[in-house]
């Protein structure tokens, strides 16, 4: 029913056929974890828009000697871009586009900082705590504020019609708030 509400228009007939997130297994909770995952987005413009926030988080982790490594799962065409952007990070960072290895690393993730989108569903399905972030350009945010009826950016918050997953988005996304 969720899809019908948002994607079924009088002149366009739509059918929901499933999503790969349903095949993801919930991870087993444990006492010690090795990673904080950074899900930077699946498009280069998302990475460019959000990278400074991830960079500040890495600086916080390294300067406060927080005992976690960073795991960045990504797509093959983004690996070199991310490696270049993270080249000066002091925190041990593992960047991978090898989907077969993701579950191994996700099993060891303490918390995820997740770009809003399908990734938030994948992290939630794995039972990993997360904070969702996103930033529209200022003009787009102003226009959409009056046109869009949903209050949240995270898909799970939209579906449930309440804040389940913490999110810091748009004008609320500042280094201080994050």
Regions found by a protein language model. Name each.
Residues 1-178:
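Nucleotide-activated sugar donor-binding and catalytic core shared by glycosyltransferases
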């Amino acid at each position: 029913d969720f899809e019908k509400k948002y994607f079924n228009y009088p002149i366009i007939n739509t059918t929901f056929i499933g999503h790969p997130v349903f095949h993801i297994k919930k991870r087993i909770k444990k006492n010690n974890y090795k990673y904080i995952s950074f899900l930077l987005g699946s498009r280069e413009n998302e990475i460019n828009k959000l990278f400074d926030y991830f960079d500040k988080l890495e600086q916080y982790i390294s300067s406060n000697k927080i005992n976690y490594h960073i795991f960045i799962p990504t797509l093959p065409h983004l690996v070199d871009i991310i490696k270049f952007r993270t080249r000066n990070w002091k925190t041990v960072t593992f960047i991978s586009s090898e989907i077969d290895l993701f579950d191994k690393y996700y099993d060891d993730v303490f918390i995820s900082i997740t770009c809003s989108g399908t990734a938030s569903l994948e992290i939630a399905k794995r039972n990993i705590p997360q904070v969702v972030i996103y930033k529209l350009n200022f003009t787009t945010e102003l226009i959409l504020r009056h046109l869009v009826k949903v209050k949240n950016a995270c898909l799970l918050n939209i579906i449930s019609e309440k804040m389940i997953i913490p999110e810091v988005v748009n004008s609320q996304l500042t280094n201080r708030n994050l």
